[in-house]
């Protein structure tokens, strides 16, 4: 048995960051991982592979407009998507990033323990790999992540009925892909495969796509999906049964649409489930409600010295949230062991969210409805990318930015973007919200020309109906 100051179970973006931060603060740290490589779902089966697919789809789509950019004599009529090459490139990027995490562990002198980690009480962890070992630690951080949610009657088989893990290794282009779930995962894969040439039907139980985003964003995304990519979006609809045939599947719909859809593949993108079973929580005083481990503002559970972060706690399921939670947990653990450090709990009202479909979507803060529900007197400013020179240069003059503000003080309550590079533009919004900028301050902030960022002061001016370029 080895004794550590800190053991982290799970090496995703929450776990590996927590391990590094603990080691930086002088804690003898171990990181437990059950899979073959470090990085967790985000690196191997989630964020990174999915965005690699999206980039391939974006490049493929751009080829069709080469002549508009003055690139002549290129015959794109014979162009086709090579999914095997996309999968191969995805694999190279994943391996490269995994090696980077391996290097960081060595650099920070973090001990790697290979196997399935399980709490067995009294600060001890069983690690079951090629052999079974038991190690102990003064502090333990759980970062066990999540898995694709299985729906009764719609079980995946990895062939025709897929989850978000399976589809990342698909080497044959679906002729017709039905996607159940219009959240971030669903719209990203809809955008990917529609651009690569698949017919796509997108099924969402809620009354709109991306139901947690501002309603104006959802409406715009549906319009662009339907108009530009011919994606068949069906909301207020669910799949009640699936019949498998040779070479196809038949989905029975109910709700606003009662059609039968025959397709080549079905992707289940209806969320994920936290991994909180079989990890030994019953041997602790930690509380679990509806599958989530309950924690305080420094990620500490009801069990002394036991922390939980990432997808197993009821906070936004985002890699960057997990990473920051890992830092908070590691710093509190170090502080409680006598290190001179002050942890900074996360302000969850200022978490940026990104969806990497085309057009991209990003947001931070309150939606217009949320703000009104919380009692604010709301003023909204919305400005399109269409008049922006840089958007037209890129050939992507679609979408808009929307600012939600409070009329009393001019405080910016939320910023919502749909359009080119939205997931990069949101970084400015994080700074604006963090600095508690007012609409008036933003109106008088100078942005360079020509850039996409010019939409920010224009949207601020739109709050007072004073936009210059519209």
For the regions a language model picked out, list residue spans one by one:
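Beta1/beta-strand and adjacent pyrophosphate-binding region of the FAD-binding site
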Residues: 1-12, 173-183
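Glycine-rich flavin
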Residues: 2-4, 20-27, 33-173, 206-210, ...
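Flexible, glycine-rich terminal cap/loop adjacent to redox cofactors
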Residues: 7-35, 48, 53-59, 351, ...
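Short hydrophobic core segments
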Residues: 7-9, 117, 135-145, 179-180, ...
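Short glycine/serine/threonine-rich phosphate/pyrophosphate-binding segments
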Residues: 14-21, 161, 185-189, 195, ...
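Glycine-rich dinucleotide-binding loop and its adjacent helix/turn
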Residues: 47, 144-199, 203, 233, ...
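Short, acidic, Ser/Thr-enriched surface-loop or helix-capping motifs
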Residues: 114, 295-297, 406-407
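FAD-site-proximal beta/loop scaffold in flavoenzymes
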Residues: 157-174, 260-340
């Amino acid at each position: 048995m080895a004794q550590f100051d800190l053991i982290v179970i799970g090496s995703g973006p929450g776990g590996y960051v927590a391990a590094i931060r603990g080691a930086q603060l002088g804690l003898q740290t171990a990181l437990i991982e059950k899979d073959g490589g470090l990085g967790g779902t985000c690196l191997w089966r989630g964020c990174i592979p999915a965005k690699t697919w999206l980039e391939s789809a974006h490049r493929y789509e751009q080829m069709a407009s080469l002549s508009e950019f003055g690139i002549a004599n290129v015959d794109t009529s014979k162009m086709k998507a090579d999914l095997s090459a996309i999968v191969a490139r995805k694999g190279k990027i994943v391996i490269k990033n995994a090696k980077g995490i391996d290097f960081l562990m060595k650099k920070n002198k973090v001990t790697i323990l290979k196997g399935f980690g399980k709490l067995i009480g009294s600060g001890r962890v069983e690690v079951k790999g090629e052999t079974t070992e038991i190690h102990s630690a003064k502090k333990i951080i759980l970062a066990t992540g999540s898995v694709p949610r299985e729906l009764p009657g719609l079980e995946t088989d990895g062939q025709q009925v897929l989850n978000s893990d399976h589809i990342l290794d698909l080497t044959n282009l679906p002729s017709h892909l039905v996607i159940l779930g219009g959240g971030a995962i669903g719209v990203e894969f809809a955008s990917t495969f529609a651009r690569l040439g698949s017919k796509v039907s997108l099924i969402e139980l809620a009354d709109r796509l991306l139901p947690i985003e501002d309603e104006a964003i959802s409406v715009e995304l549906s319009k662009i999906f339907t108009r530009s990519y011919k994606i068949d979006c069906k909301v207020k609809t669910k799949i009640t049964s699936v019949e498998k045939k040779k070479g196809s599947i038949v989905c029975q719909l109910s709700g606003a649409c009662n059609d039968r859809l025959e397709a080549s593949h079905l992707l289940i993108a209806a969320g994920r489930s936290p991994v909180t079973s079989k990890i030994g929580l019953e041997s602790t005083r930690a509380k679990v409600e509806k599958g989530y481990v309950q924690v305080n503002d420094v990620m500490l559970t009801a069990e002394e010295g036991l922390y939980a972060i990432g997808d197993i706690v009821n906070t936004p399921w985002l890699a960057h949230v997990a990473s920051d939670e890992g830092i908070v947990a590691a710093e509190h653990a170090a502080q409680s062991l006598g290190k001179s450090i002050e942890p900074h709990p996360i302000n969850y009202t200022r978490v940026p969210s990104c969806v990497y479909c085309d057009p991209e979507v990003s947001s931070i803060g309150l939606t217009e409805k949320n703000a009104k529900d919380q009692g604010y007197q709301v003023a909204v400013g919305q400005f399109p990318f269409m008049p922006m020179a840089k958007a037209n240069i890129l050939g992507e003059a679609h979408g808009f930015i929307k600012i939600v503000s409070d009329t009393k003080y001019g405080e910016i309550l939320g910023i919502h973007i749909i359009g080119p590079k939205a997931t990069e533009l949101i970084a400015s919004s994080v700074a604006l919200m963090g600095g508690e900028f007012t609409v008036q301050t933003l109106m008088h902030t100078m942005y360079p020309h020509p850039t996409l960022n010019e939409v920010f002061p224009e949207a601020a001016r739109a709050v007072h109906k004073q936009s210059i370029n519209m």
